Regions:
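S-adenosylmethionine/decaboxylated-SAM
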Residues: 9, 13, 38-40, 44-55, ...
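Generic detection of intrinsically disordered/low-complexity segments and helix-coil linkers/edges
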Residues: 3, 33, 200-203
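Short alpha-helical hairpin
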Residues: 25-45
């Protein structure tokens, strides 16, 4: 059943909008790429504003959009229009994948985002978000307002990354976002699967680099 009232979700959304991130502001100004804030907030209302004990934050959507946009811009500057392959672990409701899809769309660059999660894409369920107040939905239904981006850029895969990633064919992974399991062993496994298919200049972005909460991620990255 829904975890909160509509009023509570809207209150949380209003509060998280007030957060400021000077380092991300500087990053956006330095690169010249920044996601449309209103677009981001609307997507987050349906995919990131949830009931949980830890503080709400979806600033990683800004980082992903800017990092991928800069990567695309640098490739386009060398006249490379090669179709990009992007991997994401930890789809959840689809927020991060859509932020990356928006970067591809805004820079008019071909690419495919393969996103992996244990949660099914086409099974009706509650998602701990404001949409639960309507009725249980599949992820596909939850993301219907952004269905054009989903159709053009995103492929959803269900399963444990330890079992699924080795079976997925990809000669090269240009860009990756790791937000799946947060143990050192799992992060290193995903990293090893990706780095073997990357070339100099390709990127991996890690979520939740916080020593107190996720020391395994910090250890893997460092």
């Amino acid at each position: 059943e829904p975890s909160a009232s509509k009023e509570e979700y809207l209150r949380l959304a209003k509060e998280v909008r007030k957060l400021i991130f000077p380092e991300i502001d500087e990053y956006e100004q330095k690169t010249g790429f920044a996601i449309c804030v209103e677009w981001l907030h609307e997507l987050a209302l349906h995919t990131q504003v949830v009931i949980k004990e830890s503080p709400l934050c979806y600033a990683h959507g800004r980082v992903l959009y800017t990092a991928l946009s800069q990567y695309l811009s640098e490739r386009q500057a060398t006249s490379s229009s090669e179709r990009l392959t992007i991997w994401e672990t930890g789809t959840a409701r689809g927020f991060s994948a859509l932020c990356m899809a928006k970067a591809l769309n805004d820079l008019q660059h071909p690419g495919t985002i393969l996103t992996f999660d244990l949660l099914p894409h086409n099974t009706t369920m509650y998602w701990n978000c404001i949409d639960d107040l309507d009725e249980p939905k599949t992820r596909a239904e939850l993301l219907r307002p952004w269905q054009t981006l989903v159709r053009d850029f995103i492929l959803f895969h269900q399963g444990d990354t330890r079992l699924v990633l080795p079976k997925v064919h990809a000669e090269r992974i240009h860009f990756a976002f790791l937000d799946g399991a947060h143990t050192y062993q799992d992060v290193m496994f995903e990293f090893d699967q990706i780095r073997e298919r990357q070339l100099p200049g390709d990127m991996i972005v890690y979520d939740d680099y916080t020593p107190k909460q996720f020391p395994g991620i910090v250890r893997a990255v460092d």
